[in-house]
Amino acid sequence: MKDKIVTFGEIMLRLSPENNARFTQCNAFEAVYGGGEANTAVSLANFDVDANYVTKLPKHIIGQAAINSLRQYGVGVDHIVRGGDQIGIYFLEKKTSQRPTNVIYNRAGSAFALATADDFNWDEIFDCATWFHFSGITPAISDEMTNICITACQKAKEKGMTVSCDLNYRSKLWSSEKACEAMSRICQYVDVCIANEDDAIGIFSMNPADANGEEKNAYIARELMKKFPFKMVASVWRTETSITTFKLQSMIYTEGKAYYSKEFFMHILDYIGAGDAYCAGLIYSLINNFDPQKAVEFSNAASCLKHTVSGDYNLVTVDEVMKLAFSDAGNEVQR
């Protein structure tokens, strides 16, 4: 039976000043749609996986445009709820040279932010599903959404599904204290956790300095697995090596052992969605029974390729990821 993946979260309208302009000087915005779990669903659909996305969007034409942006890549949209008045928006000022990325959210009062538990029939949504994925951004939206996530996780576990969560801490959405309280409840149901150093510090106040010589990502993973019943913790990190170049590497920790990917050195076109692409690569690897080393290489390569694709969605194929992960084909002209 083919795996059926369900992802859950908020898709938003992303507005970015053209030509790397600042907010204060732009006269036009580039508009695309995206959001953590939507990005993961699109990546999986491009990998020929049965990927389904659940959210709530207004009935007007902008809500429909967001749905169309998913449907065109083969994402299942049958369980998207329609209602409310607004779609969430985020304004993105892209990193350029030494100038950092700046994100401004305009999502309060969106259809998804005002969604209630009655909007989502998890028995129907999870019919024949094998995997449920969401991120820590979703429960951060409201107390109601925290409870909805818990209900969804409980139902997924009842049905024998695998549950994965990208912790994805956002300090602009909630405090460390509130994040810790909510995610501590949610993580009791999670099998596969994706977390980096910032997540561990921001949510659970972990201190990598306590690693005593152990590689910090492995230390964080091991400590998280002491707190929660995770079967696997994965992490991906990007290190700036110069003003224009970055290094990407990732790790999978499972059954007491850390597995590291090779490093990629890269220039960045658009890094938004790179973590979501990693999640998709990891889910694809696990549903196809890749061993941990193959899984970490595939997931890291998927994330690397997202840095070359404009917009939130990672529009690459399994073949492209495989060639980058396991050969030098990425340096050749594909004829």
Q: What positions do the PLM features span?
A:
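Conserved phosphate/ATP/ADP-binding segment of small-molecule kinases
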Residues: 173-255
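A short helix->loop->beta-strand "cap" motif at the edges of active sites that frequently abuts
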Residues: 157-162, 228-231
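Conserved post-catalytic alpha-helical subdomain immediately downstream of the catalytic base
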Residues: 262-328
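Short pre-catalytic strand/loop immediately N-terminal to key active-site residues, enriched for Gly-Thr
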Residues: 24-34, 259-273
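Conserved N-terminal subdomain of the carbohydrate kinase-like
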Residues: 50-137, 321-335
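Alpha-helix C-terminal capping segments
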Residues: 40-50, 285-288
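Beta-barrel outer-membrane channel/assembly domains of diderm bacteria
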Residues: 11-17, 39-46
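Positively charged, low-complexity intrinsically disordered leader regions
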Residues: 1-22
